[in-house]
């Protein structure tokens, strides 16, 4: 019995892993990362070089990447060449430097787009906000990560002072601090990058899972390369490139897996409270969302995404998709703050139009019917909808008690 939740979660995770085409997306991100590697290093070196007292942070960050992230021999070869290219790139003109920065920003924009797809978000941040967030991550991200590495190294060295009396303290610190630091880095990505509210606890769970799988992947890749040195025997030094590409691909697969865990946790934990499937369930949810927006319109306020979800008990991705459909219909729109409002007066929105959009497309019914009988049925259904029709304002008035909303 205790295995059922784990089995259900893994099944749901596998379905979303396949639906989001993670293997193909990881390959695309690996290639994009390879192109943006030198620009990223150039910006990072520029940040560490221009800020006073940052040399130690840069050296600590480089050592951490080599020891905990990059594959051993291939990572050192690639890092050596990339640093040489970055030092040469630092002598570029203003236009060349700008192009490098644009290339690095394009990678971050691609990561944001992929994360939004995983969370089912179709509405991206405004362009200026995206550029600001990406530039912040590009410039201050290495500094924060370098500072974290230095702090981690200090904790490890401090724990080593106790290793003479308690040897296990140093071993535990050396074994746990790198995964925790990686987990914090991944958790920050899952929490900050998607244009969607993410609970910190879910981001931490996804980040720690990704960090553990990442370290296991790194160890496994190292053992594979050491046990099957075919690439090294055939290609020599050039073997670093395919090994590095493989490492990039596996790394992005793990990062995307952690993002999927973070995005899947809310739907899995709330599965008992989700709306049960029934014929017309999407139309019912659309009407309930529009009724909530109509009630809020009378009060002159928007409605948040979480409140609309609670009203309908929809899963996050289903609620996001339904709201996007309402936006595409021109009925609702998202504010700059991320909340939702009606685009016109509630008295001008008829429920018959909503039902025909989300449950019963009578125009398609009539057009696809091969005989006159099908068209007669469509016309009778249309007449029935019109006879029982009411506006959103009338529905909101019924929900909030008589006379609470003015009916137009």
Curated annotation (Swiss-Prot):
The chain crosses the membrane at residues 29-49, 92-112, 131-151, 172-192, 197-217, 220-240, 241-261. Its main location: membrane. Keywords: Cell inner membrane, Cell membrane, Membrane, Transmembrane, Transmembrane helix. InterPro entries: UPF0761_bac (IPR023679), Virul_fac_BrkB (IPR017039), WH-like_DNA-bd_sf (IPR036388). Pfam families: Virul_fac_BrkB. It is a multi-pass membrane protein. It is found in: Cell inner membrane. The keyword ATP-binding does not apply. GO terms for cellular component: plasma membrane. Belongs to the UPF0761 family. This is UPF0761 membrane protein azo3165. It comes from Azoarcus sp. (strain BH72). The lineage of its organism: Bacteria, Pseudomonadati, Pseudomonadota, Betaproteobacteria, Rhodocyclales.
């Amino acid at each position: 019995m205790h295995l059922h939740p784990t089995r259900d979660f893994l099944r749901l995770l596998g379905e979303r892993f396949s639906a989001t085409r993670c293997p193909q997306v990881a390959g695309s991100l690996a290639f994009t990362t390879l192109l943006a590697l030198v620009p990223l290093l150039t910006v990072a070196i520029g940040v560490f070089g221009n800020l006073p007292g940052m040399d130690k942070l840069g050296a600590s960050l480089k050592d951490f990447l080599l020891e905990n992230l990059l594959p051993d021999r291939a990572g050192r070869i690639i890092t050596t060449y990339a640093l040489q290219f970055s030092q040469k790139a630092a002598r570029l003109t203003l236009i060349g430097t700008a192009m490098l920065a644009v290339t690095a920003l394009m990678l971050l924009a691609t990561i944001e787009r992929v994360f939004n797809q995983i969370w089912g978000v179709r509405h991206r941040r405004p362009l200026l906000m995206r550029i600001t967030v990406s530039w912040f991550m590009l410039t201050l991200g290495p500094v924060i990560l370098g500072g974290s590495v230095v702090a981690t190294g200090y904790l490890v060295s401090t724990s080593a002072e106790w290793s003479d009396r308690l040897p296990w303290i140093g071993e535990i610190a050396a074994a746990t601090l790198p995964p925790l630091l990686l987990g914090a880095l991944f958790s920050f990505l899952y929490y900050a990058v998607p244009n969607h509210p993410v609970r910190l606890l879910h981001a931490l769970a996804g980040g720690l899972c990704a960090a553990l799988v990442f370290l296991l992947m790194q160890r496994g890749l190292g053992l594979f390369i050491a046990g099957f040195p075919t690439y090294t025997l055939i290609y020599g030094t050039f073997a670093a490139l395919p090994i590095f590409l493989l490492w990039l691909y596996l790394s992005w697969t793990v990062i995307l897996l952690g993002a999927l865990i973070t995005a899947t946790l809310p739907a899995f934990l709330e599965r008992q409270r989700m709306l049960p499937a029934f014929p017309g369930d999407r139309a019912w949810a659309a009407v309930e969302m529009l009724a909530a927006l109509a009630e809020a319109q009378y009060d002159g306020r928007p409605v948040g995404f979480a409140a609309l979800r609670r009203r309908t008990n929809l899963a996050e991705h289903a609620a996001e998709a339904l709201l996007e459909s309402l936006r595409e219909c021109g009925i609702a729109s998202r504010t700059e703050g991320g909340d939702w409002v009606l685009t016109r007066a509630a008295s001008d929105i008829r429920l018959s139009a909503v039902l025909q959009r989300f449950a019963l497309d009578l125009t398609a019914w009539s057009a696809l019917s091969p005989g006159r009988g099908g068209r007669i049925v469509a016309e009778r259904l249309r007449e029935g909808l019109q006879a029982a029709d009411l506006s959103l304002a009338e529905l909101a008035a019924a929900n909030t008690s008589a006379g609470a909303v003015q009916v137009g």
